[in-house]
Amino acid sequence: MTIAIGKSEQKRGLFDVADDWLRRDRFVFVGWSGLLLLPCAYFALGGWLTGTTFVTSWYTHGLASSYLEGCNFLTAAVSTPPNCMGHSLLLLWGPEAQSDFTRWCQLGGLWTFVALHGSFGLIGFMLRQFEIARAVKIRPYNAIAFSGPIAVFVSVFLIYPLGQAGWFFAPSFGVAAIFRFILFFQGFHNWTLNPFHMMGVAGILGAALLCAIHGATVENTLFEDGDGANTFRAFNPTQAEETYSMVTANRFWSQIFGVAFSNKRWLHFFMLFVPVTGLWMSALGVVGLALNLRAYDFVSQEIRAAEDPEFETFYTKNNLLNEGIRAWMAAQDQPHERLVFPEEVLPRGNAL
């Protein structure tokens, strides 16, 4: 006689069922992060496509900004709310739009909709990288690297306008609109002479250089022991051996520069560190601009240029350009302020 003794199956809660379904191995992983990422990305992209296709910026900026009005991909945009709206979230059911969708679009409600859903969508994408890295048991450096673009997006589209008078001063979501915002940053904040911008440029361009050098070096030192017709068929994806020779690469760059990375860990960490640090420095600089912190000022050159008509430097010439940007842009962008600049404040020659 055989007696089978077993434990009764524990009752599974709703959380366990949801966890199993969300983290199931499927073609497109959903995960808990997907609950944030997927709806937010859908709404942000949908709001942007809706705005650039149908919605005018006549009521907020006095501009045409949609395909319906004759714009193209480079000139269409979802524009920021008008200056009078301040930092209102412009909820569809709020006191401004009062659940009127047309009025909500006219007031710039799509911009806050896209900005907020876009921010949470980017955060959801970073959490997705954390979640999948944990599931497949690898380090989470991809997610850490993606914090750089998130920091830049949040600082430019949310923190900067929060430090200014309203969402009006944030960039609109469009190609030409972003270019105009860059000119605005230069004219009103002298952004190119800001040390944080300099660090950001060094990080991004330095990363591009590192990426090009690294890719070329790996291609140059591939082992030719495969039978395939090209690089992509020559190796088994699960091979145990190295694909390229680090020793040969080290010898090459030692001869070129006199120094070279001695191991792959330091090399690849450096390639991670340079662009991410550049992005974070840029984000910190924009946070400073939100508080109206100034860039470098070389006052001695300004005073001498004002006193001596024959003295000029590239710095003083750029200052005149910035003054011109401010004089033209302020009156154009803020007609409601009725800004009238007297002749003596407009740029003339090299007199500051």
Swiss-Prot record:
Known partners and oligomeric status: PSII is composed of 1 copy each of membrane proteins PsbA, PsbB, PsbC, PsbD, PsbE, PsbF, PsbH, PsbI, PsbJ, PsbK, PsbL, PsbM, PsbT, PsbX, PsbY, PsbZ, Psb30/Ycf12, at least 3 peripheral proteins of the oxygen-evolving complex and a large number of cofactors. It forms dimeric complexes.
Amino acids binding Fe cation: 214, 268
Sequence intervals crossing the membrane: 40-60, 124-140, 152-165, 207-227, 278-294
CDD domains the record matches: Photosystem-II_D2
Residue positions binding chlorophyll a PD2: 197
Superkingdom, taxonomy of origin: Eukaryota
Broad class of where this protein is predominantly found: plastid
Gene Ontology biological process terms, A to Z: photosynthetic electron transport in photosystem II
Binding site for pheophytin a: 129, 142
UniProt binding sites for chlorophyll a ChlzD2: 117
Residues where Phosphothreonine is found: 2
Protein localization: Plastid, Chloroplast thylakoid membrane
GO molecular function: chlorophyll binding; electron transporter, transferring electrons within the cyclic electron transport pathway of photosynthesis activity; iron ion binding; oxygen evolving activity
Annotated function: Photosystem II (PSII) is a light-driven water:plastoquinone oxidoreductase that uses light energy to abstract electrons from H(2)O, generating O(2) and a proton gradient subsequently used for ATP formation. It consists of a core antenna complex that captures photons, and an electron transfer chain that converts photonic excitation into a charge separation. The D1/D2 (PsbA/PsbD) reaction center heterodimer binds P680, the primary electron donor of PSII as well as several subsequent electron acceptors. D2 is needed for assembly of a stable PSII complex.
Family affiliation: Belongs to the reaction center PufL/M/PsbA/D family.
Protein's name according to its UniProt entry: Photosystem II D2 protein
Pfam families referenced in this protein's UniProt entry, alphabetically: Photo_RC (PF00124)
Record EC number: 1.10.3.9
Catalyses which reaction(s): 2 a plastoquinone + 4 hnu + 2 H2O = 2 a plastoquinol + O2
EC class (word): oxidoreductase
GO CC annotations on file: chloroplast thylakoid membrane; photosystem II
Gene: psbD
Organism the protein comes from: Tupiella akineta
Residues reported to bind a plastoquinone: 214, 261
